[in-house]
């Protein structure tokens, strides 16, 4: 086949252009048409990757493919801010070279002759794992996230998580790459087909045959969408008047009322808030809204001698830290507080070691010891604030054995006019519900309000253009085994890499002994 031979030609830049075009088309189709395209879209990438000669042109070609990948999926970053968006695409494309560089060094200095593809897979999943943990985590492009549009095909994410999905997708692509390289041998084709199709068949059967537990307890959650973007110049008092009119007119009893992220943003201080009018209005809302609990997002200022921000009142300066927080108000006199811990890199949070850059940012602080759960009526609810829920590892490692649901406060004003970003965000959140087997309810300032079942199904979803109240009766659950598996995943991957090194040494010694024995035998003859 001329097209296939052109795709596998290793020398010509013209053939690389063909691979680049096919890669871009298939990758875009996997995100915007159907995620099943992801099971073949990386074949052109592997054709380039497994060239024997690694030189400057090779790294340049991989960088171009990485940039195409980033741009095809998150092009909307440039719609929000051309300079920062372009910088993010370029930096992330360079970062995606890191697992390849580590793999090349590992193969070269470990003298790995067998299992090179397995080593690449292990390094790639380790990279995805590490990319979840540092200050500049941008986990949007974790390969397994592509199946957010069709969670019914990957119900087994509740066992191995989204990174298990990455391993499956990359393995399927590698097998197809080998098939094309060897002219589609029938026996190899059966193996590739089984690897690709069996997980889908098992997941589909599970979806059809195993119904949700009808005996599980339910909880009524009311999520309110305000359609007030984070940049709207409107006072907190006016915002609460709008919310109050919505919630008061809705006469249905509410177990939990979930308001959006950073709804309160006008000079909200932790030590003054319980004494102010906004708090009094929310306490009054417990009765007038027919609800038992109100969870609201706030830009919260906390006095802190080492804080980055300074307030000047009556000629006195006070340092403070600013947090993106969720507050829970109910009939008790206790104010429950959850502080956001995972931020959009640079836009929301700049590490202290980069403070010399003086970047324009919200300047949020972190408190890793603050709770992530609210206890309501004997049940535990994980509180996720916007970008936190994109991070698979943060969610699963923060859950407790008796967590019953995920409640999300989001703004989505970050996406501006980009509906593509909002849709991707919604689908990624669906995977967080699926891989942890927990229902998820999401409020929003300027986006999609939704309720998701523990299997990732959309129970309710609405892109709001005017203030909206959504009611959802969610079926409470408990975390899947993934939150246990995730703790040991890096140790398992590193153990396999170590085992490959040991086996490589054993093979070399065995080969050397066999070669020497053969040479002596020939010498005797």
Identify the residue ranges that each predicted region occupies.
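Membrane-embedded alpha-helical bundles of multi-pass enzymes
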Residues: 2-210, 417, 444, 459, ...
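Short, conserved active-site loops that position catalytic residues or coordinate cofactors/metal ions
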Residues: 31-47, 69, 74-76, 225, ...
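Soluble catalytic regions of membrane-associated enzymes that act on cell-envelope
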Residues: 206-344, 373-378, 383, 387
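Non-cytosolic juxtamembrane linkers/loops
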Residues: 15, 197-251, 417-425, 430-437, ...
